[in-house]
Amino acid sequence: MYPLDGSARPHPPGTTRLNSVEPDKQIGFTVLVRPQTGAPRLPDLAQWQAIPIAERQFLSTAGFERTYGSSEDDIVSVASFLEKAGMTIRSRHAGAGTVEVQAKTCQIHSVFAVQLLYYRGQLRPAARKRRDDKQPAEETYIGFEGCISLPAALHDKVIHIFGLDTRTFGASGGYSGDPPRAQRLIVAELAALYGFPAGVDASQQTIGIFSGEGNDDKGQSLSNYRPADVAAYFNNQTVGYNRAPTVVPVSLTVADQTYRNDPDHPTQELSQDIMTAATIAQGCTVNVYFSDLTEQGWLAFLTRVLFPQGEEKRPTIVSISWTMYDEQTYRDRLSFLFQRLAVVGTSVFAIAGDWGANNNIIDGQPHVGWPGSDPWVTCVGGTVVGNVRSSGAFTEHAWSDRDNPDSQFTIDGHLGVTGGGMSRVFATPPYQLSSGISAVTDCNGERWTGGRFIPDITGMVGFRGFIVNGKRNYFIGTSCSTPLYAGLFAALASALGGGGEGGVLFGPLNTVLYQIDRGVYRDITFGHNDSGDMPACAYFAAGEGYDTVSGLGSVDGRRTLEELRRIYWPKTKGFGCFRN
C-alpha cells in the first residue's frame, strides 16, 4: 500500500471522536485521476503574469479536456478496479478526471486501509445562525485518522479522493464608523456613483453563483430563490437596470445527496446574489449551483462550472459569497480547481468576510478566509458609502461597524467588519510582489510577510430594494460587494465586445487588476478591521495605496473600461454607455 500524498485531514481543536461508521453504511466519494501522459502542467500565476493582457488565450471546455484531461484508459482502469472490489461506479468524466463511486464503509476500509469514524465538532457562529436555534451549535461528520492508502493498481493513477471527510467548511457572508449621512442604497444608485456602465447588453455573459447551504435534517434546501421575486425586482428597476436575467438552477449530487432550488422557501443571501449581479450585467444568464459546503461539494460545484451539461452555458464569471478560514482548508487539493478555470478564461470573485481581522475565529489571532485567500480568486472587501452630493461625489470608508447602534450597516446590533489580512496558507503571489506589495503592518506595528494578502478590491456592503418572498428586503455584507463586481466585469466584457468562448475573457483577473493603472481605483484611507470581540487580537488599518482592509480600493467603472479599452483596443467592438 502507498500513502496518498495530501490526504490527511487533521481535526480542529475541540473535536470529539465518537464511534466507527457502520460497516454497511453507503458512502459516496469522488476519485481524482491523474492527467493524461504528456499533458502540460497548468499555467501558474507567474506564467499568466508574463503574458501581455491582450495577448492571453483561453481554451474552450473541449480544448481543456483534450489538453489537460485524464486518459480514458486510466479512467477505465481505476473504475474497473473499484468495481471488482464490489463498489458501484455512478459516473466518470475523463475531462475532469473524476470517477464518482458509491461503496460500503467496509469496502472503503478494505481498499484504502482507512477506518471511517464519526466526529463531533463545533460549528462556526456564522454557520450556526442559519440553523434551527434549538439544535446544538455543533455538527457530526465522518472523517478518519492519518492518511488514505492506495493499492499498487491505483498508485500513480489516483491523485486524490474527495468525500471521505464530510465536515462543513464555509459560511455565508452577510448578515471606525460610517461616513456622514450613510444609508443603504439601491444597487442601481451605487452603480451610478461608481460609474458602472448602464444598459450594456450582457446577454452573451453567464455568471455562476454558488449556493452552498445544502439541506437541513429534513431534506429541505436552506438556500433558495423564487423566480417571481427576481421578475418583480427587475420590474421595479429604472431603465438601464431593468432587464431581467435568465436564471438557471443547476442541481448537483454530492455523495448520496442531491441539492436543488426550493422556490417556496426563498432566502435573502441567494436572492440578493442573483439580483445584484444581474442588475449590473443586464440580460445575462445566471447559473445557480446548488451544493453543500463539504470538500466534495466544492469539487462538484467547480467541476460543473468547467464542464456544463446539456444546454447549460459555461460561466465566464463566478461569484462566491461563502468563506472559511483558510488554515482549515486544504489548499493544494482545491486550488487547482480555480487554476483550471483560469485556463478557460473564467474569473472568480469571493468575499473577504464580515467578521473583521479574526474572521470569526476567537483565538486572539488574525485569520483570513478561503476561497478569497486563494491567489487565483479575486477577493472583495467591504466599504460604506455616504455623504453623497448632488454632483455625484461621495465619501467612502472601510466597513467597520462592530457594536455601532447608529449604523444601518450593523447586523444583529453588533456584527459587521470587513475581512482582510495575510494568509498563512498561500504564499505572496507574483502579481502582488511585482506591484511592490510584500509586507503589511498591523495595529501593533508587527510586519506580516510571505503570505497572500487580501482583499484585492473593495466595495459597498449595504443594499436595499431586494424582493424576497414577495416583500422588500435589504442585505448587508461583503456578500453584496462581491456579486456587484461579478456583474461589473461581466458588463465590461460585453462593453469590450466580449462574450462567451472566443470573446474578451479576463481569466485570472488579479493578474489584470494589479497591472492596470491605479487611477481606476478609489483609494480608501479611513477605517480599520478590528473584529471587536478579542481585545488582544491584532487588526489592520486602511491607508494610502494597497492595504489589507480595502485592497487596491473600490473600482471606478468608467475609468476601468477606458483602461481596458486601451489594452484590448484591437479586439473591441463596442463601448457601452454610462448613466450619470
From Swiss-Prot:
Residues 1-21 are annotated as: Disordered. The keyword Glycoprotein applies. GO terms for cellular component: extracellular region. Glycans are attached at residues 236, 529. It catalyses: Release of an N-terminal tripeptide from a polypeptide. Residues 181-567 form the Peptidase S53 domain. Its cofactor is Ca(2+). SMART domains: Pro-kuma_activ. The keyword Metal-binding applies. Ca(2+) binds at residues 523-524, 543, 545, 547. It holds the Pfam family Pro-kuma_activ. Binds 1 Ca(2+) ion per subunit. GO terms for molecular function: endopeptidase activity; metal ion binding; serine-type endopeptidase activity; tripeptidyl-peptidase activity. InterPro entries: Peptidase_S8/S53_dom_sf, Peptidase_S8_Ser-AS, S53_propep, Sedolisin_dom, Tripeptidyl-peptidase_I. Secreted tripeptidyl-peptidase which degrades proteins at acidic pHs and is involved in virulence. This is Tripeptidyl-peptidase sed5. The gene is sed5.
